[in-house]
Structure formats: C-alpha cells, structure tokens
Amino acid sequence: MSVPLFSNIPPELICRVFESLDDFSEVAALAQTGRIFYHTWREHAAPICRAVGPRVFRNFIEAERLLDMQEKAEGISQPQDGGEQESTVRVKRLMSNARCAAAACADWVEFCQIQDTLGAFDRGPEGSPETYMRPSECARFDYTFYSLWTVGVMQSALHLQRHASTFLENCTVQELCRLDEMATWAYNYNENEFGTTGLDLRDEVWMAGYEVVSKYWKAYLKEGATTPGPDAHYTPIGFFAFFDHTQRYLDMYKDR
C-alpha cells in the first residue's frame, strides 16, 4: 500500500493539526518539516494563533489587546489575511510581552516572599505551595499587568488617549483598585531589574499608565469611598488586591 504524499493532505486538515499543538515551538517545528506545512502556517496564521495562544499565555485576550494597542500606537496596520507578518512579528511580540509579564510576576512573588521572611506577611506554613502566590492569584496579577501596560500604551499616544479614558471609565472598582495597587508596587517597591526581557517599569509608557490610573483612583476616593482592607499581618505592606483570601475586601468598595 502506497503512503499518501503530504501534498495530497487537505490544507484544512493540516491547519487543524497546527491548531491542536501545545505551544508555538511545536508550531515552528512543524512548519519546517515541509513546504505544504510552511505555506499552511503562513496562510492560516491568525486562526492557528488564536487556537494555540490560550494554551501558551495566561490571559490571552488581554495579551492580544495589548499587542493591538502597541501596533496602533506605532502606526502598524494589523494584517487582515493572517499572512506572514502575523505569523512572525505578532507571535514574537506576544512571546516577548509574555516574558515581561512572567518576569514581573516572578518579581512580585519574590517581594511577597521577602515580606513573609520579615514577618510582614503570613500566608501559612513555610514550604507550603500556596505560601506566596497561587495560580489563580498569578492569573489575576497577569491580567492587571497587561491591563496597566495597555493603559500606558494608550495614554502615551496622543491619538489613543480617549481609548485610555474609555477603558478606565469602564473598569469596575475592583479592577481600578488592582490597577492602582500594581502601579504603586511597580513604581515604589521593585528594583526594575528584569534582565534581558527589555521590561522597564520606569519608561514613559509605564509612567503614563501610573499617572492616569492614579488620577482615576483618587477621583473615586474623593467621592467619599471608604478604603477597606485586611489586617496588615496578612498582606505584604498592605497590598491586598491580588490575593484570594482578601478579595472580599475589594467587594466592599461601592460601585462608581
């Protein structure tokens, strides 16, 4: 029995194989195995990215939103056909942004660990897998990180500032609280040393984000909102917006 040639495989079937892969390294490897695989990847990059992306990135929707705004801020037209540009540039930038998010989250976890060592943060027995940050809390951190970065991108580009205002006006009080808390941590409580990721929490984009988020949060507090919070012994220096056991305090804020 003869073995069918790859050229006889319908592109739709090859596309489904790409979409079932676990990460983009597997996508790249498969694309290099034959011309038909390479061309299928180039021609169907958009649906492949949307299928594989959520398995690679936490908060993929927010990651794509950030990338879209970065491209708009830089005047880059977003490809409509899912062609070669999306198959290379967009994926590479998504991965670069994700490395920045991971580096920031790791820095936050280290911050929590230091506070626990100093006796300023007690999450449970030493060595417990939930001592510092649970997966759900890391996901909450990443969501806010991408959102704050997106706000900074929009606010630092004159033609996108109205989008930043709309974004913040549509945030829930809980989301706005997390944005303000992350801005406070990012500006005041980290060394801004993220190696080769290229992340700089003091550049003009991030500073623009901090400023506008602080403006909106202060405006909310001026409306007479109370500022609930748990005992400082159970949070690192009063930060509480990302932890599972303190979410009930965020729910105490009144809607805007």
Predicted regions and their residues:
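Helix-boundary capping/turn motifs
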Residues: N8-P11, G119
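Short, surface-exposed helix-loop/turn micro-motifs enriched in polar/charged residues
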Residues: L5, A28-A29, C49, E137
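Charged/polar low-complexity intrinsically disordered regions
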Residues: R42-D244
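Short helix-loop-helix/strand-helix junction enriched in hydrophobic and basic residues
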Residues: P10-V17, S25-A46
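CRL adaptor-proximal regions
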Residues: M1-N8
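Charge-dense, low-complexity intrinsically disordered regions
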Residues: T246-R256
